[in-house]
Amino acid sequence: MSSDRFRISQTPLFGRKVKKFKKNEKETLDREVQRIMADPDIGAEKKGDLQGIRVHRYKFNSQELLLAYSVEEDEILLITIGSHENYYRDLKGYVK
């Protein structure tokens, strides 16, 4: 699967969270987004209320971060990012 096949877009929530990141956090995030573009199935597919959403886990400075996204034909929508604490509760609230 070619990474140039996908267009990346983001929700306002994702944009607000990334705006608070430091430069090195953004660089790590960019690498992880490239990994998702290369293999959109890399994230765990969610069920129930979050059906159609995938969550990719990665570490930054020993802290695990979760990146929620969805894939539609030629677009990857970055939904939200954060640590595990209250992550799924907040994600469900945003998706509804």
What is the meaning of each model-derived region?
Residues 1-7, 16, 60-66, 70-96:
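Enriched for short, Lys/Arg-rich terminal
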Residues 32-35, 84:
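Conserved short hydrophobic interaction patches
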Residues 14, 19, 23, 51-56, ...:
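Short alpha-helical segments used as structural interaction elements across diverse proteins
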Residues 1-32:
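Arg/Lys-rich, positively charged N-terminal/basic patches that mediate binding to nucleic acids
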Residues 30, 37, 79:
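A cross-family signal for key residues in well-ordered alpha-helices
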Residues 23, 34, 38, 93-96:
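Short, intrinsically disordered, mixed-charge
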Residues 34-61:
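A short, surface-exposed loop/turn module that caps and links secondary-structure elements
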Residues 12, 46, 50, 54, ...:
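Solvent-exposed, flexible loop/coil residues
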